[in-house]
């Protein structure tokens, strides 16, 4: 179905004249154009707002169940095309949020990934195979295995990082056949499941920490108990506020009637990140969860009390440890590390430690995990940017930030092998045979990397690269495996279509590099550009007529005619600018030069504007405004006045277009969203004839006639967000960069 958007006609047009060329200020820090702000390649910079701001509409919460409602719409569409094939990487990994060893099957390890589903290993974590249906949400929060081999999985990530957005889940699931099939068993309105605890003496008795929706109050929050293997549930501990959920439930290893629950008061509002509150705290039950008492001896209720992590020593359950985050609403700093020797009746705050504090940075809510050696009550590991370890009960600490990836989230000891420990972090799965004190071995096969972008070469179908969440910019030359060649959060990646060794890669906030030797050596070129603001994902593009001509978008558009060595601004500020409200908008998000007219360039912005110039930036005309975040502009190769625009944003209660086309240079627009799911469209590609390909949060879709009638494209692609698609018409292939399942390829 097509809709004509008459409201966005000529009346919206505005003409701006480009300013004279400005030299980059050599004293400005690279990356943001803002004095004093520099984002390091690796280190303690807080997770950005980028993904939350992109997926929501200004002033609105992310609607409850928006993701799974859109997924249901996608499932109803017919499918066309062949099978998608995994391109990789499989050796890099991605964020692991929980893990569990199967008591009934030795050496069988299950891991839950942030947006890549559930996986199983039977070879000491060396390789992993999917243990989760491809057509269910891939956003996971928890996994647990009962003594009889029954598996429980909680959906929805409980860690609110990764761009300040988590994909909500659809509740709790159970499998009795090692993950071959799964059955939903309730708590569908939980938003995210933080932890599942199964009574080691009774596999029918389990507790679930329902963390709740990050974006909406209420729902299934708190601690739930089932005495019949998940057939029915009772909430046994509710939060003190409607934004308080549970993050963890712990059994006393010697007495399963004695339990502890950690509660966290938090919410991501449209213009505020509230990650602390009066509802945060630790509770204890001595009667199997029937009643609970708050442990005020640890910390008193407070508006600035953040996320807490607790560990119990299996060899001495009276000894406990707690790490506490505290701070203003938008951040949690390290408050302190506490220990108890009487089962939580009283607590002592241990002396401050610089390594421990630095490991939590300004976002202690990203970690909040304490793991105690089952055989040594003084040997403790703590999650942080690095892995922190004490061997004397917290009196001194060492930080391991060399032998594994940053950002630790999960750990489990193998009960059959006393010194074997598994660790999960933003780089995947690691194993240590030294009790977690070094000697970490990374998994060889874990294809669940979160991609922001992809790049391919029409000259060589064995060359791919892409930017990833917390795993840098990755490359695969000749299908000989993948490696990181630029660090940080990888963003834009490009491969020159006429020279496979001329590649470009960026990390966050437009810190970009060019290379003429395939990325072996890289030259930082951002200081040569001119911008006051740069997006977390700053667009860089080749001109389709000449790859020596390039474009770089900050709040102004920059142009290079020497393959990115020197740059000249060719526009004024094309955004509404910052500071009008609490939203840090004001950057260009997409650039498209016309193949049929090298003087015509289209630009989209994060504050919903689309501009066009037909004279290489001498003047600019506003052709669309008041829209959600513009994710892509694609220009018809044969007509500079025909442009396709894709929009982000989940909306509740009313229709939101996500694909628009103009055939008259932006004087009028037609809605081509048609039967697409009501969800963000992240990219659009023009295929042969009138064919359109769209990448969305629910996969890839095709409109054969370009008329708004869409079908799901291909089989075998999991239900995972696809942030970028690349088309190689000469080899008839489409490559999808997914946010959670690495890259896939489809022959079309």
Task: Please provide the spans of the model-predicted regions.
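Beta-propeller blade termini and top-face loops
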Residues: 26-748
